[in-house]
Amino acid sequence: MAQRPPGVGGAIVRQVSGHERCPLLFLDVDGPLLPFGGSGQSGRGDTDVAPHLSRLRVEAGPRLAELPCTLVWATTWLEDANSEIAPWLGLPNLPVVTWPEPTEAQEREDQWLGLCWKTRAVVDWAAGRPFAWVDDEITEADREWVSSHHPAPAMLWRVDASRGLTDRDFADLGEWLRQLT
């Protein structure tokens, strides 16, 4: 079996305790769906694709739609993910996490702990529901913080930003999500 690069993937997983609601999947765009490496070719094969979308992994759309979860954008694209990304992926409009300004105390604590700036907002948005979060900025500090601040199962999955979501990522996410449903 091939080894994952250090720090890529990984999860914090806890047992489900009678929590029956559909899990959430928080999805970043830049990195997981728009890798920073690669050929720069659109998966659609369109010649008139906007340059910033030329690396979009359109084959990920149907695979995301098949996962047993509620998809939620967790990206700086905000609502633009619904107008510019979702149609290329064949996805409907999805809920979007908004990014509130942290307090000065939160910002200092996040820097001291090494938390991704999205972590608190993702946990707040989940509101106690099980969730998976796919992002290229997740660290072990985020996994530890979520483990101690979120009561439900959570899987924080770091994607290699140069490759985007891979077959193995989809297999591991799907397996984890199916265990919850």
What do these predicted ranges mean?
Residues 7-10:
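Residue-identity detector for glycine
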Residues 14-108, 178:
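Alpha-helical substrate-recognition element adjacent to the catalytic core
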Residues 84-181:
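C-terminal cap/substrate-recognition subdomain and adjoining C-terminal extension
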